A protein has these predicted regions:
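Thiamine diphosphate
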Residues: 3-147
Length: 147
């Protein structure tokens, strides 16, 4: 739901912490596409950021809002792209992982911790998986949606 801010925050945190500690960043595939250029910075500086990409192959937060507030009238939420994040990582010279279940994620994460530079872990999720809690537009903490 934060679109274009995730990567630079992870880069800043990793620069502040140094290479002895690991930053783990969680993002969606849509957000990752919006900031692919920032991956170049992490690669150039060999920052050991572990990026976990929740891939539902749609713009999940937009779809979630359209489900909750617009009667599932979906508009512009399916970009019709099926990115292979493992091959994309390899194109950057990185280690990439593709996970379909928790056991695969646990194995990938354990291996990612051993890598020296950035790594990407793609986790496939259902296109209707929700990100909660959320506060509706114009609302406050009293309007929080928990389920």
């Amino acid at each position: 739901g934060l679109g274009d801010v995730y990567k630079r925050q992870a880069i800043g945190a990793q620069m502040a912490l140094g290479r002895d500690q690991r930053v783990v960043m969680f993002t969606g595939d849509g957000s990752f596409h919006m900031n692919l250029n920032e991956a170049c910075t992490a690669v150039s500086y060999e920052l050991p950021i572990i990026t976990v990409i929740f891939n539902n192959q749609v713009l999940g937060m937009v779809r979630q809002w359209q489900t909750a507030f617009y009667g599932k009238r979906f508009s512009q939420t399916d970009p019709h792209r099926k990115t292979n994040f493992v091959k994309l990582a390899e194109g950057f010279g990185l280690k990439g992982y593709h996970c379909e279940n928790l056991a695969q994620f646990q194995e990938a994460f354990a291996d990612a911790l051993k890598q020296k530079g950035p790594t990407w872990i793609e986790c496939m999720i259902d296109k209707d998986e929700k990100v909660l809690p959320m506060i509706p537009g114009g609302g406050d903490i009293n309007d929080i949606i928990m389920k």
